[in-house]
Amino acid sequence: MKIFGYADEGLPVEAVVSAELAEITLVASTDELRRIAKFLESCAEGMEARGRSWEHEHLSDKDRSFEGSAHFVVFNPEWGQRYTGSE
């Protein structure tokens, strides 16, 4: 697993460059943590069901209560990889 992110510096989206992070801290209530866990479980199920065709999902798209929060995105590391027939 890798974690990427960027600081909210008010830059236009085309000027934003993600960086690999060594640590993240979630400042969240117990209810928010449970909703995030549900989102992560849903992402895992989507990846299992759709394989390489499942690209990514935004938490705020699945749970509108996170619309004003920092962007939380899960990305499939196998997305777009060609099937080699050896799997």
Annotate each language-model stretch with its function:
Residues 1-87:
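Positively charged, low-complexity terminal tracts
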